[in-house]
Amino acid sequence: MTDLSTLRLSYTHGELRRADLNADPAQQFQSWLDAALRSGLREPYAMSLATADREGRPSVRTVLLRGIQDGGLTFFTNYESHKGHDLTDNPQAEVLFFWAEHERQVRAYGPVERLSSEDSAAYFHSRPRESQLAAHASDPQSAPVSNRAELETRLTALHERFAADQEVPCPEFWGGYRIQVQEWEFWQGRPNRMHDRFRYRRNDAGWHIDRLMP
């Protein structure tokens, strides 16, 4: 087995100074995300979403960021999934983006609210038809399924149920969430673990920025 304790990299890609930061953290995030997109990183809009149930048991998974609205981060999922139940019982979450090639990381935390059914349906109908059918087939998400064949059978039945020219309805159990971000952290890797870290915290005046110990 590889001795992981010997594996390390020196981060030399860049630096992050207070003077470089946008006063609006959502704009700062957008600039970093745009840089990741321009450089051709694979799915730089993928984020690790951490939630916790009513007992405080945490869970984490990867979801796709689907928009930035009024400084909030939006994503879509099955409301009956594990994360959906977590967010019903404990409507707060933290997400993390890590762009290894840029030696950058962003964390964002805040309370979570559901999007309107109209906004959820609009996004649902923008998705490929096969993805729309798959959302129906995989309900309830995270529930045990006996085998792959059962899942494929359900998808086949949905193809028969909805003709090719028939609109697939957005399920009531599926839709979007918005994280109303109250705290952001931007991390830039630096040599010898002397990283640059800045935290934005919302206050009555807007946003307060602190440099953090690495």
Swiss-Prot record:
A GO term for molecular function: FMN binding
Residue ranges of the region described as Disordered: 126-146
Pathway(s) it belongs to: Cofactor metabolism; pyridoxal 5'-phosphate salvage; pyridoxal 5'-phosphate from pyridoxamine 5'-phosphate: step 1/1; Cofactor metabolism; pyridoxal 5'-phosphate salvage; pyridoxal 5'-phosphate from pyridoxine 5'-phosphate: step 1/1
Cofactor section: FMN
GO BP of this protein: pyridoxine biosynthetic process
Protein keywords: Flavoprotein, FMN, Oxidoreductase, Pyridoxine biosynthesis
Protein residues bound to substrate: 8-11, 66, 123, 127, 131, 193-195
Cofactor binding, note field: Binds 1 FMN per subunit.
InterPro entries: Pyridox_Oxase, Pyridox_Oxase_CS, Pyridox_Oxase_N, Pyridoxamine_oxidase_dimer_C, Split_barrel_FMN-bd
Pfam families, per the entry: PNP_phzG_C (PF10590), PNPOx_N (PF01243)
Catalytic reaction annotation: pyridoxamine 5'-phosphate + O2 + H2O = pyridoxal 5'-phosphate + H2O2 + NH4(+); pyridoxine 5'-phosphate + O2 = pyridoxal 5'-phosphate + H2O2
Enzyme Commission designation: 1.4.3.5
UniProt-annotated binding residues for FMN: 61-66, 76-77, 83, 105, 141-142, 187, 197
Family: Belongs to the pyridoxamine 5'-phosphate oxidase family.
Record's function text: Catalyzes the oxidation of either pyridoxine 5'-phosphate (PNP) or pyridoxamine 5'-phosphate (PMP) into pyridoxal 5'-phosphate (PLP).
Subunit structure: Homodimer.
NCBIfam families the UniProt entry points to: pdxH, PRK05679.1
Protein name per Swiss-Prot or TrEMBL: Pyridoxine/pyridoxamine 5'-phosphate oxidase
